[in-house]
Regions:
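Tight coil/turn sites that cap or link beta-strands
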Residues: 80-83, 133
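Short, surface-exposed charged micro-motifs
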Residues: 75, 108, 146
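A short beta-loop-beta micro-motif enriched in histidine and acidic residues
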Residues: 70-72, 86-107
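Catalytic core of Fe(II)/2-oxoglutarate
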Residues: 113-163
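Non-heme Fe(II)/2-oxoglutarate
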Residues: 1-75
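Short, conserved beta-strand element in jelly-roll/cupin
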Residues: 78-80, 97-116, 161
Length: 163
């Protein structure tokens, strides 16, 4: 059993993600596509900010065992109050390498306690007030999604991709 509260309080060395093309791999046309969609939709890009933590190897091993998958990548995302991720699909420069393993599977775990204002949209499904530890399986690892924090506490999720 993972103590998610302990995990959240001990996270270090996160990578902040904002709408700053200088920090994106703009050689990958998919980044430009998402940025164009946001600009064309008059999206408030100042509201886009989250932090990814990649020091998740121990958790990855436990969760991958529970899900019976071989992990390729995992991370914890944190959205601070008042921010969101923007509607997007995840772009990974290592995707070609991952696909050599066959069909990819993706799962997300709600690791925060339920809190007013926390919302996760996956395709056409909306998730809110999910109990801590709830696991959802994605139908497509590249599904469009959006995390939103309209609450007063940080919103954390654990994500894992494997085969």
């Amino acid at each position: 059993m993972i103590n998610w509260n302990n995990v959240m309080t001990t996270l270090k060395g996160g990578r902040v993600v904002t709408v700053d093309p200088a920090s994106w791999n703009m050689n990958n046309p998919e980044y430009a596509e998402i940025l164009k969609l946001w600009k064309d939709g008059n999206f408030n890009t100042d509201s886009v900010k989250w932090t990814n933590y990649y020091t998740t190897q121990e958790i990855e091993t436990v969760i991958a065992g529970e899900l019976n998958i071989t992990p390729l990548r995992s991370w914890i995302s944190c959205i601070e109050p008042g921010y969101m991720t923007g509607y997007h699909y995840d772009i990974d420069d290592n995707e070609e390498e991952y696909l050599k393993h066959g069909l990819l599977k993706r799962y997300s775990v709600f690791i925060s306690n339920p809190s007013v204002g926390h919302l996760f949209i996956l395709g056409k499904e909306y998730f809110y007030n999910n109990p801590q530890g709830t696991i959802i399986k994605w139908s497509n690892y590249r599904e469009w999604h959006n995390g939103i924090n309209g609450g007063l506490e940080n919103k954390y999720m654990f994500h894992i991709i494997g085969y």
